[in-house]
C-alpha cells in the first residue's frame, strides 16, 4: 500500500469526483482510478459507490477514511520532523 493511494482516496472523497481529484493530484483520471482500484482489490473492499453522482464512500470507505487521513497526516509529520533534524544537524 502506498501513501499516494491513500491521498488519492482522500482527494476523491473531498471532491466527490474522480476527474477533479486526478487534476488536484496531478495525475490522469485513469491513473488515479487504477491506483484506487488496485488498493480495493488488495483489501477486497470498495471505497466508493461509483454508481452514484456525486461519488460517495461506501460503508467500508466511511469506516476507513479517517484512518487514511491519519496515516497521511502522520507521514507529513514524519517528513517535517526528519527535515528539521537535517537542518538542525547542519
Residue spans for each PLM region:
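Alpha-helical residues within the helix-turn-helix
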Residues: 23-24, 41, 62
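Interdomain hinge and pocket-entrance segments immediately C-terminal to HTH DNA-binding domains
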Residues: 83-90
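Short helix-boundary/capping micro-motifs
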Residues: 10-28
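Helix-turn-helix DNA-binding elements, focusing on the entry/boundary residues of the two helices
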Residues: 17-18, 36, 50
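A short LG(V/I)-centered, amphipathic sequence patch enriched
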Residues: 40-57, 79
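The N-cap/first-turn positions of alpha helices
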Residues: 2-5, 29, 61, 68
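A short, exposed helix-loop element centered on a Lys and neighboring polar residues
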Residues: 76-83
